[in-house]
């Protein structure tokens, strides 16, 4: 369950970073 929460945060941060680029 902890990995899912980390993946969810990483996915949101990754999408924001990809949109900024």
Curated annotation (Swiss-Prot):
GO cellular component terms, A-Z: extracellular region
Q: Which UniProt keywords apply?
A: Antibiotic, Antimicrobial, Fungicide, Secreted
Point to the regions of Basic residues compositional bias: 10-21
Any keyword Secreted?
A: yes
Q: Please cite one Gene Ontology biological process associated with this protein.
A: defense response to fungus
Region (Disordered) residue ranges read: 1-21
Subcellular localization, as worded in the UniProt entry: Secreted
Q: What does this protein do?
A: Strong antimicrobial activity against several Gram-positive and Gram-negative bacteria and fungi.
- Provide the protein name: Misgurin
């Amino acid at each position: 369950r902890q990995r899912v929460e980390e993946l969810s945060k990483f996915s949101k941060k990754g999408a924001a970073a990809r949109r900024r680029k």
